[in-house]
C-alpha cells in the first residue's frame, strides 16, 4: 500500500470512477447516485486534506476567542478556565495531532455550554449577543469547508476556505 494519503485517495477515486462505476447496474439509480456522491466526497476530502490542521486550529481559536469574550463580558469566570487553558496549550503544541485539537475544542464548547447555563439570567441578552457574534467566524469557515459538497445555496458568496484559515493565529 502507498503511504501517501493524497495518492491513496487518487487511487481510490480512479478505481471507483473507472472500474466500479462500470460494474454498477445503470438501472439502479440509487446505487449510481451513491457512487457519484462517494467519489465527490473523496475528491472533496482530497482537496481539503492539506488544510485540515489549519482548519481545526482555526475552529479551536474561534472557540477560545468566544470563551474569552464570554468570561470577560459576563464578568464570571471559573467554569471556562481549564478548557481554555487546554485549547491554548493545544494551539501552541506543534506536535499535537488533529484529533487532540478537535477534542480540546469540543471540551471547550461543553464548558461554554455549562458557563451559559450558570451565568446570571440578567446577562442572557449579553451572552446571546456574544455567542452569536463569536460563532460567525466558525460558521463561515465550516460553510467554506463544505461548499464543494454542492448543498450551499449561495456558494459564490462564500470565501475560499484557504482565505479563512490563513491568519497568523491559525498557521
Model-derived features: positions:
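Non-membrane alpha-helical secondary structure
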Residues: 1, 37, 55-62, 76-79, ...
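Acidic, low-complexity proline/glycine-rich segments
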Residues: 1-13
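N-terminal interaction modules that seed assembly of large macromolecular complexes
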Residues: 10-71
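Surface-exposed polar/charged interaction patches
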Residues: 19-22, 26, 48, 70-76, ...
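Structured domain cores in non-transmembrane regions
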Residues: 54, 64-89
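Amphipathic protein-protein interaction modules
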Residues: 80-143
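Glycine-rich, aromatic-bearing surface loops/beta-hairpins
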Residues: 123-171
